[in-house]
Amino acid sequence: MLVSYKWLKELVDVDVTTAELAEKMSTTGIEVEGVETPAEGLSKLVVGHIVSCEDVPDTHLHLCQVDTGDDELRQVVCGAPNVKTGINVIVAVPGARIADNYKIKKGKIRGMESLGMICSLQELGLSESIIPKEFSDGIQILPEGAIPGDSIFSYLDLDDEIIELSITPNRADALSMRGVAHEVAAIYGKKVHFEEKNLIEEAERAADKISVVIESDKVLSYSARIVKNVTVAPSPQWLQNKLMNAGIRPINNVVDVTNYVLLTYGQPMHAFDFDKFDGTTIVARNAENGEKLITLDGEERDLIADDLVIAVNDQPVALAGVMGGQSTEIGSSSKTVVLEAAVFNGTSIRKTSGRLNLRSESSSRFEKGINYDTVSEAMDFAAAMLQELAGGQVLSGQVTEGVLPTEPVEVSTTLGYVNTRLGTELTYTDIEEVFEKLGFAISGSEVKFTVLVPRRRWDIAIQADLVEEIARIYGYEKLPTTLPEAGATAGELTSMQRLRRRVRTVAEGAGLSEIITYALTTPEKAVQFSTQATNITELMWPMTVDRSALRQNVVSGMLDTIAYNVARKNSNLAVYEIGKVFEQTGNPKEDLPTEVETFTFALTGLVEEKDFQTKSKPVDFFYAKGIVEALFIKLKLDVTFVAQKGLASMHPGRTATILLDGKEIGFVGQVHPQTAKQYDIPETYVAEINLSTIESQMNQALIFEDITKYPSVSRDIALLLAESVSHHDIVSAIETSGVKRLTAIKLFDVYAGNNIAEGYKSMAYSLTFQNPNDNLTDEEVAKYMEKITKSLVEKVNAEIR
């Protein structure tokens, strides 16, 4: 929002520097982006009256004699196409500075002396987008009353100061000059004084000419007025100046009046050429799918049913709240004007303007909110201006459909509530002074008071909003600084937080790097690596298909990360994530999923790269399994690894499930080569472990056992076995032998080859025995070994070597 300081001072008596005002507004809730002066850097620019203008033969140049208030006429050579005798222009005399700090000097053009330069607004640094189209390709023509020799700054309001405000959505009331004036008046304790117009209506009724119908619940109110016998012409210079300083291009007096009212009241308006209507009934309705409309910018718009249009004779003539239609555009020959002032649903306008990429000053205000209280007043103000500036005759009455609430909103609170939240000791009198500055009526007492909030401040609805207003106007800098007095409770980590930290320590100690992947994925990937897939929880309105379902595993997202890195030549990767997966056992549309904390890692490439003295070492199953084992050693939990051939997307010969007390808590293994090919990644090993289940085990109390003073005894045993027998099978056979004093089983050798029959292998184990209360004898150990040997022979058909 660009605010003219000259214009602001017409609405409220404020006499401070713009720097001070900017600082004050920023500290009370409306951020000021900056302050600019259009005249900054410009100098020696005066009004010139062209006494004579002669064409230079065989050129586009003109030799002008210009009165600049000096004793003699000034000769200036000008190439502008619209220069002519009798007009007032902008003259940069020798020594003047124009845009880009360019200095004007005396010179000769085609042998003709030129004592200055006749300037366009572009040459003064004004943007092309705000310059009237009739002057966009030529020089600026000043009003007839301009006095030669006077500085041009006051004529064009270039000496104004423009304050740029950054308006947040909750303070859309400041998207108008009246709204800003109310804010400044409250800050400085001043009164606003707004211009009032005396509207004279004809006896002829507007309702006899047109009718209004609302056919959409997205249209809250629609009002129309008719002004006849208007003369379309350029606006007076003062109006053009105000619009240009606000960043709006002047068009003609009719369109400029609607834009002036937009800036003044924050009420978007539109003007139709009534003579171009094919009917007399104005209908505000939803568009039809496939309906088309050519807007004022000349673009044909394809409409959908969610768009709002203004239609006459079932033909759209405007895109409601966004832009008018070309078919009813105000032109130089327009005589009868229909003024529109309406309130449309902000969400609908935002969707339409966003879909069509068509943002406008009107759509911006409808999106953020409109002051219901001044819709009718703004309409009458615009009609009165057309009387003044276009000689129009206003037909009697507004034709209105829809009723808007205009009564103030009542919000109640207590003095104690205010002081508790601000840490102040304000009195009821202090509160009254604040709301008097804001222009809000207040009644009640220190026990409880009620504030009548005018409709212009639609952001205030609850007592917390009142507290904010009190703090803003009273002054944030006046609020006392105190330390919190509430008693503190010593905090501690939850069991899951402790577990996560211990897992993170092990993972990073193993050289893994933490990543965070998306919790949303495709429905297929959501269950791809799940050991027990549940119902899929899908979003009703996903942003993309790739992010439409809550994951039930982390591995699939981690493989996407692996693929992304491998595609960029980063092939040695070791990553992990501690995150949630979402299991849904109920109805996904009615029940929330269960969040399960998991630890997942992925390895690919080389553990060690080749150098002059060592060979490269690729990642394998045992390296991945070793990380898992290191984790459970750190957690002091005993787990069992069981070969798993049926896990989807995993290699059937290099995958194991992880059991804790007989319950499956995860898996570790190689991604199936076909799955790896789908992800376009090399050989990769992954593991996923359920931390939520582990947490419940971690909470069990530990029982202390005395450290025994008696030594342990070890025995080795070598077995000849079929290749199909796994390490787990052997350990299970040993553990089920019934030997109570067995404390450790360690595999220290595996061999297959020479002297071993085909289809067989040799495995050697070290078995440790210990009695915590006495020394073991050789006879006892021999009995234990006999039991173990018998169990191995019976259960896995082992041959003792």
Swiss-Prot record:
PROSITE patterns: B5, FDX_ACB, TRBD. Residues 708-801 form the FDX-ACB domain. Belongs to the phenylalanyl-tRNA synthetase beta subunit family. Type 1 subfamily. Gene3D superfamilies: 3.30.56.10, Bira Bifunctional Protein, Domain 2 (3.30.930.10), Ferrodoxin-fold anticodon-binding domain (3.30.70.380), Nucleic acid-binding proteins (2.40.50.140), Phenylalanyl-trna Synthetase, Chain B, domain 3 (3.50.40.10). Residues 39-153 form the tRNA-binding domain. Its cofactor is Mg(2+). This is Phenylalanine--tRNA ligase beta subunit. Its main location: cytoplasm. Binds 2 magnesium ions per tetramer. Keywords: Aminoacyl-tRNA synthetase, ATP-binding, Cytoplasm, Ligase, Magnesium, Metal-binding, Nucleotide-binding, Protein biosynthesis, RNA-binding, tRNA-binding. It catalyses: tRNA(Phe) + L-phenylalanine + ATP = L-phenylalanyl-tRNA(Phe) + AMP + diphosphate + H(+). InterPro entries: aa-tRNA-synth_II/BPL/LPL, B3/B4_tRNA-bd, DNA-bd_dom_put_sf, Fdx_antiC-bd, Fdx_antiC-bd_sf, NA-bd_OB-fold, Phe-tRNA-ligase_IIc_bsu, Phe-tRNA-ligase_IIc_bsu_bact. Pfam families: B3_4, B5, FDX-ACB, tRNA_bind, tRNA_synthFbeta. Residues 406-481 form the B5 domain. GO terms for molecular function: ATP binding; catalytic activity, acting on a protein; magnesium ion binding; phenylalanine-tRNA ligase activity; transferase activity; tRNA binding. Tetramer of two alpha and two beta subunits. One of its GO terms (cellular component) is phenylalanine-tRNA ligase complex. It comes from the Bacteria. One of its GO terms (biological process) is phenylalanyl-tRNA aminoacylation. PANTHER family: PHENYLALANINE--TRNA LIGASE BETA SUBUNIT (PTHR10947:SF0), PHENYLALANYL-TRNA SYNTHETASE BETA CHAIN AND LEUCINE-RICH REPEAT-CONTAINING PROTEIN 47 (PTHR10947). It is an enzyme of class 6 (ligase). It is found in: Cytoplasm. Its EC number is 6.1.1.20. Mg(2+) binds at residues 459, 465, 468-469.
